[in-house]
Curated annotation (Swiss-Prot):
It comes from Neurospora crassa (strain ATCC 24698 / 74-OR23-1A / CBS 708.71 / DSM 1257 / FGSC 987). Belongs to the mitochondrion-specific ribosomal protein mS41 family. InterPro entries: Ribosomal_mS41, SAM/pointed_sf, SAM_Ribosomal_mS41. The gene is fyv4. Component of the mitochondrial ribosome (mitoribosome), a dedicated translation machinery responsible for the synthesis of mitochondrial genome-encoded proteins, including at least some of the essential transmembrane subunits of the mitochondrial respiratory chain. The mitoribosomes are attached to the mitochondrial inner membrane and translation products are cotranslationally integrated into the membrane. This is Small ribosomal subunit protein mS41.
Amino acid sequence: MKSSLRIQSTLGLLFRPCAVSAPATAPGLNAHARWAHKTAAQLPLIPKPTPFVPDVPTFLTLIGRDLKQHADKFPTWEALFTLTTDQLRELGVEPPRARRYLLRWRQRFREGKFGIGGDLKHVENGVAYLKIHEKEASPTRTSRRVVNVPANQHVEEVSEGERVKVKGYKVKGVSTIVGPYALPVQKGVAKLAVTEGMWEDKRGHKVDGGERRRAEVRFKRGVAERKALREKMGFY
């Protein structure tokens, strides 16, 4: 009788269902996932146009890569920021790297990561004026910075809150504004106009045909150069 009870007890232990433990997750990974989800939720799906980028054609002109040819495929600003990569392909945005490039710049714009001029506030017909704001830093020194103000107003006439400090530009000497795409207008004044490819990420170029063909291309070039040298020396 006792041996029978021992056998039943042993069988019970063998066939007892095991509790499935939840996979352990590092606390840091959970925190990172929550932060990423929160950040993504906070970003607007459709960002607002800016004074320097008021519409689809301007956006596509700025980011370059000849994407402005596709401007008529986006009937609205909302369409530009909501179409999926499959929809872009159906509309004829080719090649695939052009779609990837457009999607990258869409995300940057959502995050407020603009190119040159993206932070400008006073823009008219795609042109912004940059002027020099002088301020006495000490009895012996005057600080000068480049600001964006309305074209028909002097810097002193514009309130402090309306003077937009422009990133990427500085004052050289006393009255010269220097920076990308800055066109001098007169002493202490420059203008910045929307230009094709202002924000473009420049692509690298393959040297000697790329990684796989490089050795072959360089070998053939060496053969041709040696042959030309022998011909020049009269060996042929």
